[in-house]
Amino acid sequence: ATDFSAAVNVLKNAGCDVVIACMNQNPLATLMNTMRDVNYNVNVVTSYVNASATTLGAFVDTGAITANRMVYCTAWLDVTTEQGLADYTAFYTAMSAWELANGESGSTYALNSYAMAGYIAGNIFVQALQAVDKAGVELNYANFAKVMEETNFAIPMGGSISYANGDRLGVTALALNCVSLEKNEAGVYA
C-alpha cells in the first residue's frame, strides 16, 4: 500500500494502544510516516525483517520513530543475556577469522543475519552429530533421526529446539529489540 492514512486514522480513533505491523521495510516506512503525520503516538511491533538499525535509524531521523512511538522488532536471537552475548562473540570471532583469511573486511558476514542463520543451522547439525557419537551408535539415517527425536538442542544466541516425544518445537521465545534514539560514538544508530 502507498497510503495508510485511512487505516491509521481508524486505529487512532479506536484508541488502539499498539500497532502490529506485518510488513517489510517499504510499507513500514509509509506506515510510520503516516503515524507521524497524524500524530498517532503508540508503539509498533513488527517482524525481525525490519530489525535494521540503518532502516530504523532513518525513521528516527525523519521523526517517524520517537520516544512516544517506538518500533519493536521480534528477534529469535537474544544477545542481551550473558550466554547470548558469549554465543554471538563466538560466532563473530569465527566469521571474522574466516573473512580475514579470505581477503574480506572481517565484519561483512559477521553482521549478516543470513550468515547467523547458516551458522546456527550448522551448529545444530554438529550438536546432533555429537549426540550420535555420545550415544555410541553408528552414524546412519535411523540413528541420526532417533537422536534428533531424543535431544534438546541449544540454539546459539538464544533458546532451544526440541523434537522429543513427537514435538516440533522450534524457537519458543522471542526477544523484542528497538533502535536507540541517538547515534553512538561511531555516528550510527544501534
Where are these regions (language model features)?
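Segments of small-molecule ligand-sensing domains
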Residues: 102-115, 122, 126-189
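Glycine-rich, aromatic-lined ligand/substrate-binding cores of catalytic
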Residues: 23, 42, 150
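Extracellular/periplasmic Venus flytrap/periplasmic-binding protein
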Residues: 1-38
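Extracellular/periplasmic catalytic domains that process cell-envelope and extracellular macromolecules
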Residues: 12-14, 37-39, 62-66, 139, ...
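Solvent-exposed loop/turn segments at secondary-structure junctions
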Residues: 1-3, 24-29, 49-55, 75-80, ...
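Extracellular/periplasmic periplasmic-binding protein-like sensory domains
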Residues: 35-119
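Stable alpha-helical elements in mature extracytoplasmic
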Residues: 4-7, 24-31, 84-94, 121, ...
